[in-house]
Structure formats: C-alpha cells, structure tokens
Amino acid sequence: RTGWAKLPNGRHIYNTGMQVIGDAGGIEVKLSDTLPQLELTDRCTEMEDKQVLQSYLRKLSREPDILILLVAHMVRSLLASMFERLGFPLRYILYLVGVQGSGKTTAANDFGLPFTDVTQNAPAPATRALSSKPAVRDFAAEYRDMSALLDDVCTSSSAETRRISTDIAAYTLRFAADRIYEAISRPGGGQRKVRCTAGLVITGEFPMQKPSDLTRCVIVEVDHQMRGKEADDRMVSSATATRFIKYLAEHFDSVSDEIRMALSNFRADAVEEGGPRQQQHMGELSCSFQLLLEYARSIGAIDDLEMAEWRLRLQNALGRALSANMCLTAKFERENVSNVAKIIVDAMKSET
C-alpha cells in the first residue's frame, strides 16, 4: 500500500507508489509494480528548506480561508494511518463548493494534491465525477495516506443529472466518513473487503442538502473568483510536501506524541456550537496545519510572532467553514420542518 510503513530497524518511510521517502537505514525497500504510479518531485533543489516554506506560506496568504483548509486536509490525509492508530480515524470529506470557474479544481490540484501520476503527468490521485458507486468505492479504496480529488461531483445541469450526482455524493460521504467495508471481487475469484483509505476532496456547485450529509463534510465555500495564481504554485507545493514528509519520517514518533497530546486535550463534546462531530473535524484540521507551522518554525521559516499570525488565520478559516456548515444545516432543517408541516396540513385538508 501507499503511505507510511515501519521497517524492522524501527525507522519509518513513506511510499508514494514509485518512491520511498525517508531514511531506510540501509534496508533495501522493494515496491510492488502493482502500486499506483505516483511520485513526489522536488524541483526547488536550489532553494533551502527555509526559502521553500516562506514561498509556500506567502502563496497560502493569497486566499487563507480556502488554501489553509486544503493544506490542513492534505497534511491530515498524509498522516491518516498515524491518526487512526491513535484512535482518530478520518471521518469527513473536504467539500469545495462554489460556482463554475471560481478556481476550485485548480486550487485543489495545486495545494491539495502534491503527487503526480507519471502515466498522465497530472496531479494525483484525481478523477472526474464518477458515474457509479462501485467506481467511487474503487477509487477511494486504492490510495492510503494521501488526499484524493473527486472533481465536479455535484453540478447543476439537468434535474436528473443533479439527482444522480447528489445520490452518488451522498454514497461517497457515507463510504468515507462511516468507515464502511464493502466486498469487491478478486480478479482470480472470491471477494475481499475494502474501505475508504484516502482523504477525499470533492468539488461541486451546490451543497449537500441533508443535515446528516453535512455533518460528514467540512464545507469550504469558494464564493468568488480566486486570485493571484502563480506559475510555480504546484512546484513549490510539491517541494514543500516532499521536505515535510522527510521531516515527518525523521521525527515520526515525536510527531505522533504531539498529535496524541493535542487531541487528548481537545474535547469535541465540550464545545456547544457545531456539534461534536464537526468540532472533531475542525480539531484534527487545526492539529494538522499546526504540525506544518511547527516544521516551518523549526527551520527558521517563521518566528514566534508569525506563528501566532498564522494560527489566527487558521482560526478564521476554521470558523468560516464551521459557520458555513451550521448555516446550511439550519437552513435545510428549517426546510424539512416546513415540508413536514405542509404534508400534515395537506393530509388534514384531504380528510375534511
């Protein structure tokens, strides 16, 4: 599988599918040729770690409410197996919702998908909206410890297309967030059970409409044309991810301890607003982005004052996402109550 592996000598390495990132300590690591053909490239080799991170953070400051959450989710997905081992499985989908042409897909590719599919020379893992539930299941279960994009899941074309896409999106949410195991056929016969192991990002033009679906999402509203794209966005993003993964591999146990301490002190059920489930999502995203900030500070890319400024930006981004989710949940709950009331009134009229 892609993702983290512990070697017999106690070291941890990250497998992209085609590469091993991290010091194996002299152990030869062979990768199966059946793995996804993904790689992570660092084309900023002439830049020091500090310079790469400073460039990266400057780019995030263009659209902090959107890009911070994409990056936090990318880090959360990279460390999915570590979080799960600590008792925090990934139980949400990051949903970028906004009008067509606002830059959702470009942002997701540049800042949420640092890997490249070498067979297509394209950001990966990513696919256009899938037309069947088995296709979604197979895609979401193929990748481990990385974010993956399902693009244009909910688009507003015909009413029938919208109904089908909403149904598939709802299935995707439950397959990912509820940790559902499903049986698939083996090539040689028999079956095996799979579940979602990727950190899914989906894009769409309209939000989910059931409160139970919304609680499985972290909503990122893209309500304007995103600005300031630069030609080297993806190059710097991939270089940052490469160096950050090397740092994580070297400090794997201490990072695990940081996550355990951060989330053991975080009590989602002690927070009144947004419900425990949403608060848990936000707590995990906050922890993930702060791991990146700690790395940036450790290499001198930011100082304590800048660290505090970035934490404030993070807080604002999380607050905006939580507010969007709460507003949508309240809206659809009101509509559901109104619809039920109308049905009761109509039924009473028909009896008289």
Feature annotation, model-predicted:
Residues 1, 5-13, 18-23, 132-136, ...:
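Extended alpha-helical interface modules used as scaffolds for assembling large macromolecular complexes
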Residues 35-39, 49-65, 89-97, 151-158, ...:
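Glycine- and acidic
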Residues 62-82:
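N-terminal pre-Walker A segment at the start of P-loop NTPase domains
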Residues 97, 106-162:
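AAA+/P-loop NTPase substrate/partner-engagement loops
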Residues 100:
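The conserved Walker
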Residues 149-151, 182-183, 194-205, 219-221:
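Structural recognition of the conserved hydrophobic beta-strand(s) that form the central parallel beta-sheet
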